[in-house]
Amino acid sequence: MTVEYDLYFISMAARLLGMHPQTLRKYERLGLVQPSRTIGSMRLYSREELERLKAIKHLVEDAGINLAGVQRLLSIAEIVARIQPLMRDEPLSPREARRLSQELAQLRRMVGFE
């Protein structure tokens, strides 16, 4: 029987991911993940963060992308996630249209199209 928890201390998170705890600390310093903290400042990783770390591990180890590239890809993914709800058949309000335009401009700058 396997027991699943909602939050994992850094040692367990690292073990589950096949990574060293120091790697998780480095990713936190770079802003790739933001684990919550206990009152005693111990890191707690959610399942969502574990999935994000799995994706980072894949990008680094399997795709050969450096950490700067990973940061850029994750930023783009976050922008796309914010834009997706605006992509619907209904007409956009002027405010939504401005916001979408700003998000797209930011995305273009990030990928080097401006």
Q: Language-model segments: which ranges?
A:
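Basic helix-turn-helix/winged-helix DNA-binding cores
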Residues: 1-62
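A short, Lys/Arg-enriched interface patch at domain edges and termini
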Residues: 52-82
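Short amphipathic alpha-helical surface patches that mediate protein-protein
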Residues: 32, 74-78, 88
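Short, surface-exposed loop/turn segments at secondary-structure junctions
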Residues: 38, 67-70, 91-94
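Charged, alpha-helix-enriched surfaces in structured cytosolic catalytic cores
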Residues: 51, 68, 95, 99
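C-terminal regulatory/oligomerization modules of transcriptional regulators
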Residues: 79-114
